Amino acid sequence: MIQTLDRLMTNPMPEGRVEDILRPEGENPLLEKGYVTTSVDALLNWARTGSMWPMTFGLACCAVEMMHAGASRLDLDRYGVVFRPSPRQSDVMIVAGTLVNKMAPALRKVYDQMPDPKWVISMGSCANGGGYYHYSYSVVRGCDRIVPVDIYVPGCPPTAEALVYGILQLQKKIWRTQTIAR
């Protein structure tokens, strides 16, 4: 070990090369296979799936079903889902109900205020594609025209159980993502 330290002191490393004291030639099979970054990805995704903090953007009758999902019968707290009042504290936005043209800039503004990484759940037929009011002049035909949507929950209005299923699907999607570039 002392010889390695002497060699490092007398012969500096070439630019761009990292040398490990325990492996002087730089071969590290764990790093080559991506083991360390995979483990950090798994740790981050485990933490993100266990602590999803949605911000509600209830626009119509689907918001009532969202309140049912947060009540004691289904208890979203057991999945680590805690509703937050501020977009700066949340990482999931649940868009529930009819999105009209006047409300679209506000939706985008709230989405932009959320910290990264952020996910969007579109809840109900109106949020997914305009729903019953699809042909109205003032209705946005799907909130995916304003913000990128990760999970679509169908129904008019969807049941609280369907929203819980959508949240569980989002947790699976988060678990599969790779956050660290290799």
UniProtKB/Swiss-Prot annotation:
Membrane topology label: Peripheral membrane protein
Task: Please tell me one Gene Ontology term that the record gives under cellular component.
Answer: respiratory chain complex I
> Could you say which residues bind [4Fe-4S] cluster here?
61-62, 126, 156
- Say where the protein is mainly found: membrane
Q: In the record's cofactor note, how is the cofactor described as bound?
A: Binds 1 [4Fe-4S] cluster.
Q: Which domain of life is it from?
A: Bacteria
Localization annotation: Cell inner membrane
Record function comment = NDH-1 shuttles electrons from NADH, via FMN and iron-sulfur (Fe-S) centers, to quinones in the respiratory chain. The immediate electron acceptor for the enzyme in this species is believed to be ubiquinone. Couples the redox reaction to proton translocation (for every two electrons transferred, four hydrogen ions are translocated across the cytoplasmic membrane), and thus conserves the redox energy in a proton gradient.
Q: What is this protein called?
A: NADH-quinone oxidoreductase subunit B
* Designated gene of the protein: nuoB
